[in-house]
Structure formats: C-alpha cells, structure tokens
C-alpha cells in the first residue's frame, strides 16, 4: 500500500495544455475512481502517475517519494489496460508470470506465486490455455493477475471494463471490488462510466476539460454536486436544469413562463440562476394541481422496476423517474410537483454551486 500526492501537475502537448494544475491526495489503501468524459485528461493523469507520460510541470509522489524522474518499473505501480495486453502465444500461466521471469525469479518461486494468484482470481483451471480460448472476462482477470503477481504498491486501471458486455461488466465490477478488499492495495481507476465509478469508488474525482471539478464520496458527489457539469454528468437520467431568476417570494423559470413559490433563497432579487432537480425527486400529480408545473408527455421508457417519463416544459426537455404505477400516454398532460428542499442552484454564468436557504411557501388548505 502507498499514498499518492499530486501537486500542481500539468501536461502540455506543444502549446496545448491538456491537464491544468491538478492537486490531489490519495490515501494508502484507498480505491479512487477518476471519472469524466472522453478527452477530459483522466487517462493522461493516470499515465503520468504510471510514468508512461512525462509531467510538464508539478510533482507526483508515491509513498513520500517524488517519482517525476523515475522509470515506470521503479515506481511500484502495476497497470491494467482496456485491451488486456496479453501475449497471444503464451499460456495464462506464462502471461501471469512473465514479469517474474524477466526479473530472474527462480522457476519454483514463479510457479508458487502464479498458483497463488490463480487461486485468488479463480483461474486455476485455465492456466494452460492461450488467451484466444478465453472469454473477455477471463482475459481481464488474467490481465489483473499479471498486475497482482508483481505485488505493487499501487494498482492503476485504465478503463479495464470498456470492452466487456453489460453482464460481464457487472460481474467484473464485483470481482474488482472484492479483490481490493482482500488486497487492501491503493487503487486508481479511470472510467467514463458513472455506474462503474459510483459502485467501485471510496472517493470520486470528477474531471472536465483537464481540471478537477469535484472530489468526494459517491454520495457527496450525487447529493451535493459542486458544479452544473457534475450535476448533469453524474446521474442517469441526468439532473434536470431550468434557467430562472430569483424573485422576492419565488423563482421565475423559463423566461417568466413558469413560477415556483419559495419563501426566500438568500440571493438578491434578479439573480440569474440554473435550478437543478433530480428526476427521482419530481412527483407526478394531476395537471392543474396548485403549485405544480403542467407539462406535456413526450416519451415513456419502461425499466421494469419503474419508468422514466420525458416531458416538454414550454420547450424545455425534462425527465421524471418513478416506480409508481402511472402510465401516462404521449401527448397527455401531467403535473410536476417539486419541493424546494430537493432543488440545487448553480450560477448561470460560472456554473458553480450556490448554497442557498430554501423554504417552501405553504400550500393553501383545500
């Protein structure tokens, strides 16, 4: 196990900067997931930790030792890649033990360590097979075994599940998490898949445009997104965002066509905001109910345990996720009930989170 410290790390390609002064701390034994869209710099950051990319500026330390000038093999890291990177002419056992052979480890010790890793990953019955005779999940376990046998300080995963089908991804997520609990090794996992990120991480690092948007537990990221980007990137369906203006006793939405009553927000009247609400926090009611927003149903997606209802709100797309036994027809009218306690507010200009005081206006007695 080893801690990782990243201070002011930048990466430039010619005159283009792709990673902008990243500062991060990963604790020993922690499982950290770096999440972000394609091109956000997450894999580049991982490769700089591994030593596969040079650092343009800043400093990376592993277990208290600055590794900027160290070769990849000197950093105590083992990497698992998206494409497995197995030798096709070698057996599973030979692939797992190859690094030990190169290091000159005696044959008897190699065999013992290969067997131990194979037991951990349930690969004992496959040791004589070649990679072509394995399933995608089995190949990925072999790639993990090749990393494990080196007994590294740090495991680095570069989108290792991207080539697997949906069922195998679920299975491998579980196996990776159980393996981490067993080994208690520091792990850094890069992905663009938010489900992988939320289910695997002790802590999440959300990146966008080469910068860190937010660091926190999966629960913190989901319930208190630090920016509009995080709010809409994490969560499926994405958080609904409606542009609005703060009024004395409420919120004017969609250019003034809709209004939500609120006692006060703590923001100056006239402030432009982006109001966010998670689809599962919206309650469907009959159209015309006091305090509800009327909308037109566009599409209903059945999910088995529930459904996602996509509606049109004066031209703005909006989604509702519910497990209630409601099946509105496309084109029909529904009411959307939103509690101020479930609202998130972001700056319309900067996109940063605005922490406001939210109190609903009591509905009139019927």
Curated annotation (Swiss-Prot):
Superkingdom field: Bacteria
CDD domains (alphabetical): ABC_MalK_N
GO terms for biological process, alphabetical: carbohydrate transport
Catalytic activity, EC: 7.6.2.10
Keywords, sorted A to Z: ATP-binding, Cell inner membrane, Cell membrane, Membrane, Nucleotide-binding, Sugar transport, Translocase, Transport
Domain ABC transporter: from-to ranges: 4-234
UniProt enzyme class: translocase
Chief localisation class: membrane
One GO molecular-function entry: ATP binding
Pfam assignment, any one: TOBE_2
Places the protein is found: Cell inner membrane
Topology of the protein relative to the lipid bilayer: Peripheral membrane protein
Listed GO CC annotations: ATP-binding cassette (ABC) transporter complex, substrate-binding subunit-containing
Catalysed transformations (reactions): sn-glycerol 3-phosphate(out) + ATP + H2O = sn-glycerol 3-phosphate(in) + ADP + phosphate + H(+)
Residues that, per the record, bind ATP: 36-43
InterPro entries attached to this UniProt entry: AAA+_ATPase, ABC_transporter-like_ATP-bd, ABC_transporter-like_CS, ABC_transpr_MalK-like, ABC_transpr_MalK/UgpC-like, Mo/tungstate-bd_C_term_dom, NA-bd_OB-fold, P-loop_NTPase
PANTHER family: MALTODEXTRIN IMPORT ATP-BINDING PROTEIN MSMX (PTHR43875), OSMOPROTECTIVE COMPOUNDS UPTAKE ATP-BINDING PROTEIN GGTA (PTHR43875:SF1)
Family the UniProt entry places it in: Belongs to the ABC transporter superfamily. sn-glycerol-3-phosphate importer (TC 3.A.1.1.3) family.
Quaternary data: The complex is composed of two ATP-binding proteins (UgpC), two transmembrane proteins (UgpA and UgpE) and a solute-binding protein (UgpB).
Chain's role: Part of the ABC transporter complex UgpBAEC involved in sn-glycerol-3-phosphate (G3P) import. Responsible for energy coupling to the transport system.
Name listed for the protein in its UniProt record: sn-glycerol-3-phosphate import ATP-binding protein UgpC
Provenance organism: Mesorhizobium japonicum (strain LMG 29417 / CECT 9101 / MAFF 303099) (Mesorhizobium loti (strain MAFF 303099))
Encoding gene (name): ugpC
